[in-house]
Amino acid sequence: MAPVEHVVADAGAFLRDAALQDIGKNIYTIREVVTEIRDKATRRRLAVLPYELRFKEPLPQYVRLVTEFSKKTGDYPSLSATDIQVLALTYQLEAEFVGVSHLKQEPQKVKVSSSIQHPETPLHISGFHLPSKPKSPQEAEKGHPACEPENLEFSSFMFWRNPLPSIDHELQELLIDRSEDVPSKEEEEAENGFEDRKDDSDDDGGGWITPNNIKQIQQELEQCDVPKDVRVGCVTTDFAMQNVLLQMGLHVLAVNGMLIREARSYILRCHGCFKTTSDMSRVFCAHCGNKTLKKVSVTVSDDGALHMHFSRNPKVLNPRGLRYSLPTPKGGKYAVNPHLTEDQRFPQLRLSRKARQKTNVFAPDYIAGVSPFVENDVSSRSATLQVRDSTLGAGRRRLNPNASRKKFVKKR
């Protein structure tokens, strides 16, 4: 018997060709999920499924409940109407077969933790197992306990660099070592060479993946468990959906059928108003409107807690954009200004009437381009500013002088 009794499948489960007959006993989905699948290979697999796919529409009350909850978590802009219906169907099946007493009505508060690594630093390299090494007692003593911040809420801004360790303990060790007998140079070289060979042998075998530890490594990297006593689950690969499901207390299943304990991904956090968004395509903050969004790694645990991992690397919050002054805003029909706000209005930059007649084949005075009597617009204002057709893109716009540019590129 399959470990999960009722499984709700998202489009990602069909696109990844998940063996849903091995994951669950009863497979549910909605018709919109099947409709949005366009590739031929997946549609061919849907035509000959080895299990019965049940279509069920969620009730409006559960759709409304999931919509309100996703707005509180901040994932509502990243969810489509199909995603919300899949979440509502999972909530409805959980209410029918298990109950809603253990589900959460409000998302938990965000817990903040700091990290020395850059947020885009790869934590796990494919093909290698890098276990975390515990700190030795000497390294723990070197830390400065008085300089540790009590409240880590603003540690990414106030404490970019770790405090310098105390050197009193090291000076005492040096004085003690000088009083002892100093060994000869030959003995030191022999001992150092033996230790180097020993360290090399330890390093060679420390990070390899072997048949003995591959299952343990897969569980550590994927943060998954074998589902036990799980009656209702949802198979999805979308982070926004996983975030909502975990924070509500519902079960999330991976494509291989494992139960996901944590969902790890990235969000954008405004360092001006401290609001977050999971829409990674945004450039300006939706709350304050400034261009102050920074990428932050987050981890959603199985209890629904959202942990944000800030970086103490000073390169994350660099002072780029404060060196050169912006150009004076220009007005008029053909003004070109840098894009500074999301709701900034720009002129339409239309072509002249003579230039539009070249592309309008239904115009009474249309002349083919191969004719020797064709006229080219070279004297109008739009022609001198190199304004092109709106279908091909607007005219050339002045860039922000503080923006980064590619190096070693020849200028025209």
UniProtKB/Swiss-Prot annotation:
What are the BP-aspect GO terms?
Answer: maturation of SSU-rRNA
Listed binding positions for Zn(2+) are: 270, 273, 285, 288
Q: Domain of life of the organism in this record? A: Eukaryota
ZnF NOB1 residues are 260-332
What do the Gene Ontology cellular component annotations say?
A: nucleus; preribosome, small subunit precursor
The residues covered by the PINc domain are: 5-108
Residues recorded as bearing Phosphoserine in the entry: 184, 201, 325, 352
- Region annotated Disordered sits at 121-147, 178-210
Residue ranges with Basic and acidic residues bias: 136-147
**Principal place where this protein is found?**
nucleus
Q: Which Pfam families does the entry link to?
A: PIN_6, WRNPLPNID, Zn_ribbon_NOB1
User: Coiled-coil ranges per the record?
Assistant: none
Q: According to the UniProt record, which cysteines are disulfide-bonded?
A: none
InterPro entries given for it? NOB1, Nob1_euk, NOB1_Zf-like_sf, NOB1_Zn-bd, PIN_dom, Ribonuclease_PIN, WRNPLPNID
Similarity annotation: Belongs to the NOB1 family.
Function statement: May play a role in mRNA degradation. Endonuclease required for processing of 20S pre-rRNA precursor and biogenesis of 40S ribosomal subunits.
> Subunit comment for this entry?
May interact with UPF2. Component of the small ribosomal subunit, ribosomal RNA processing complex (SSU RRP complex).
Instruction: Give the protein name, as stated in the record.
Output: RNA-binding protein NOB1
Q: What is the lineage of its organism?
A: Eukaryota, Metazoa, Chordata, Craniata, Vertebrata
Q: Which gene encodes it?
A: NOB1
